From Swiss-Prot:
A cellular component annotation (GO) from this entry: plasma membrane
Extracellular side: 54-58, 132-152, 197-222, 285-300, 371-373, 428-441
Gene: LHT2
Name of this chain's protein: Lysine histidine transporter 2
Organism in which the protein naturally occurs: Arabidopsis thaliana (Mouse-ear cress)
Lineage: Eukaryota, Viridiplantae, Streptophyta, Embryophyta, Tracheophyta
Known regulation of activity: Inhibited by diethylstibestrol (DES), 2,4-dinitrophenol (DNP) and carbonlycyanide m-chlorophenylhydrazone (CCCP).
């Protein structure tokens, strides 16, 4: 009797292993530490970096610099916590954000706390990146060929999506590492172009650093929206465990060591991308800067066209980094819950449908700036600023009023404030601009 039972559980284990070897997050575990560096850069340095001077113009110098630097420190701290908690259970790896959530809050509750937020972030980012990709392609076309007949954004988004209908079928994180590396290099390049071209232009003769809005109400709401933009700029946490899952781990060399090395490199790159763009862009253009600094810099045309093309390449990589965990969730549900056979056909259909879905939403709702502030506070703040801290308090139980305890509560309070305040600003921006928005523009 024992033998057959034994074999039944072995069969189950073998089946589980087969599924794990097939799923995108867990299938390949041979990443080097520098993979984690450029995956993290690609995930974190969003096209959001180009809206930082605009955010600065709504925050002003004092609050602006404070919030930028503070966000950088807090998010680095919460990222460190996640890297540490990846192997908090000896001999087991928490490969996905929701697995860590389930370990901290229990099977059911953990899923319900993490998965909806993670999906809002990942699908939200992918939709925003569809819009960004399409808009940047359109901009390149306008710059390179100013006399051509204008092509609607809708078609540019479709052209951008066509790339993803192909590369979404790469099986896992390691197979997109070349794309991700290219994307990380691009984000550095266009950030550098953005601030270097600003410096080259020189400070505007009548530069003005007073708040952009004329009314007090406007100032407050713009401030809140800018908070969302900055919070959104540091949001690589949704994919950090999934990236760490690709790194091999042994008792002598746990995965957190190479992962942390990669994260540090990534954060230095993030600082090199963000701070010069935000501060120099604001210093030079003051409150006349557009919500995408590349629009403010019209000349030299070839350089700005190139920068926009780099944005496109970067966004291709970012889209994939954020789509991979979604593919993983979809495929897990289909194979484990609905007992589909893990096959290429299944993968081909689910991923194509996902790309089509993000494309259609992007085409219907191409308003970029307002959505960022709204989603930023709503889903990014929790997953980036305070969920890791709450999990840390639950799992590590630091001493009350000790350094760790205080730091975590500080992050939680800041994060909760962001969650409440940023969407208010974002929503108002959406409402004000909605009058001029056209669906299917």
């Amino acid at each position: 009797m024992g033998n057959s039972e034994m074999s039944a559980s072995e069969v189950a284990a073998a089946k589980q292993k087969n599924v794990d070897d097939w799923l995108p997050i867990t299938s390949s575990r041979n990443a080097k530490w520098w993979y984690s560096a450029f995956h993290n850069v690609t995930a974190m340095v969003g096209a959001g970096v180009l809206s930082l001077p605009y955010a600065m113009s709504n925050l002003g110098w004092g609050p602006g610099v404070t919030i930028m630097v503070m966000s950088w420190i807090i998010t680095l701290y919460t990222l460190w916590q996640m890297v540490e908690m990846h192997e908090i259970v000896p001999g087991k790896r928490l490969d996905r954000y929701h697995e860590l959530g389930q370990h901290a809050f229990g099977e059911k509750l953990g899923l319900w706390i993490v998965v909806p937020q993670q999906l809002i972030v990942e699908v939200g980012v992918d939709i925003v990146y569809m819009v960004t990709g399409g808009a940047s392609l359109k901009k390149v076309h306008q710059l390179v060929c100013p006399d051509c007949k204008e092509i609607r954004t809708t078609f540019w988004i479709m052209i951008f999506a066509s790339v993803h209908f192909v590369i979404s079928h790469l099986p896992n994180f390691n197979s997109i590492s070349i794309i991700s590396l290219a994307a990380a290099v691009m984000s550095l390049t266009y950030s550098t172009i953005a601030w270097a071209a600003s410096v080259h232009k020189g400070v505007h003769p009548d530069v003005d650093y007073s708040p952009r809005a004329s009314t007090d109400v406007g100032k407050v709401f713009n401030f809140l929206n800018a908070l969302g933009d900055v919070a959104f700029a540091y949001a690589g946490h949704n994919v950090v465990l999934e990236i760490q899952a690709t790194i091999p781990s042994t008792p002598e060399m746990p995965s957190k060591v190479p992962m942390w090395r990669g994260v540090i490199v990534a954060y230095i790159v993030v600082a090199i991308c963000y701070f010069p763009v935000a501060f120099l862009g604001y210093y030079i253009f003051g409150n006349s800067v557009d919500d995408n600094i590349l629009i403010t810099l019209e000349k030299p045309i070839w350089l700005i066209a190139m920068a926009n093309m780099f944005v496109v390449i970067h966004v291709i990589g970012s889209y994939q980094i954020f789509a991979m965990p979604v593919f993983d969730m979809l495929e897990t549900v289909l194979v484990k819950k609905m007992n589909f056979n893990p096959s290429f056909k299944l993968r081909f259909i689910t991923r194509s449908l996902y790309v089509a879905f993000t494309m259609i939403v992007a085409i219907c709702v191409p308003f970029f700036g307002g959505l960022l502030g709204f989603f930023g506070g709503f889903a990014f703040a929790p997953t980036t600023y305070y969920l890791p801290c709450i999990m840390w308090l639950v799992l590590k139980k630091p001493k009350r009023f000790g350094l760790s305890w205080t730091a975590n509560w500080f992050c939680i309070i800041v994060g909760v404030l962001l969650t409440i305040l940023a969407p208010i600003g974002g929503l108002r921006t959406i409402i004000i601009n909605a009058k001029t928005y056209k669906f299917f523009s």
